[in-house]
Structures are given as C-alpha cells and as structure tokens.
Amino acid sequence: VTLTRGDLVGYVERDLDADLARWFPGRTPVAVPEQTRPVAPFLGRLAPADAAALAAFDRRVRSGRMPQFLDIYSWSYGFDFAANGCGIRDSDYETELTDEDVYSIGADGGGNLYVVLTTGQIGIWFHEEEVVEEGTRFDDLDVFVWSVVRYQAVRAGVLERAAVEADFLSLGQDGVLEPELGLLHSMK
C-alpha cells in the first residue's frame, strides 16, 4: 500500500508519541524556557489542519517530556528573527518575510532552522543567506515530523532505510528528495 499525505494528517497528535517512545526511549527530553516565543499568534495564520498539527507539536515541545530528535533548543524553537537581527527572505531571494510569516521549530545541526510558513509548509531557513530555500520544503508539519522521526531512526540504527525509502519516495517531498540537501541523500 502506497503511503499518501492524507494518511499522515493528524500524525503529530495521533502517532508521534508512540514513535518517539519506540525509537528514542533514552534520549534527553526537549527543554525550552517558559519565555520562548508563544505559538498562539502564529496559529491563527494557518489553515485549521496545519494549526492543529503545530499546536499539538508545541504542547509536546513545552511538556518537557518529548525526546530530542530535531535539535529543539532555546535558540532554535520559536526563534525571534527580528530581535536577533536576522533577515528572512522567501525562495525568490527578494520577498522579505517577518516573524509573523514563519515560526521556527528546530534546527538541522548546521545552524539552519526548520520553519513553518503561513502556507503550512515547512522549509529550511539558511542562516548564511537568510533565505527559506524552495527545494527544501515539506507540504505540512505532519509529513515533516513523520519524515524526520524516521530519518533520525535510520541514522540511529533502529530502523532500516529499506523500511522507509518507498514511503519517502511516494510522499514526493522536496525536503526528502532534493539531491544535495534532502533527507534521503543524508542517509547514504
């Protein structure tokens, strides 16, 4: 059976906790300061399904119980771009975005941030160019989190690449398939 985006709607709320417990039981839990930028104002800019996924993710991040799997720290979750003097440009390298247009949910290990856009897409904000690149995107948070959890499980040696590769291909996400930056490339 081919996995579709529709199959993953509600993943963060429904299945994330079980997957994290299965593959990452001993990992240190995420801890962000109480004063971390609130997500509530951003939720109103999202479609209902995207807002539900981000709200569910935020509850887990702030619970102090979610295992670390996405470089979620005080500097990467709810990052305040303006207060830190950082610009944000869309993939056309011209359209200026603001903190109202994105919400950062973690880092990639190289100083780049994963951001939720008001379209519901997830992209990578590259710190050197201060741009959210087009070829790095995921259609929504449920698909992104599902993909990153499995990517990290493969990297940790608790899941075989062959067990997820067909699903990654069927979902057709740029953030997985991009030849140089995609998750599949990084699993080699």
Explain the meaning of each model-derived region.
Residues 1-113, 176-188:
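A surface-exposed partner-binding patch
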Residues 116-120:
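Short acidic-glycine loop/turn motifs at beta-strand connectors
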Residues 149-188:
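Acidic, proline/glycine-rich low-complexity IDRs
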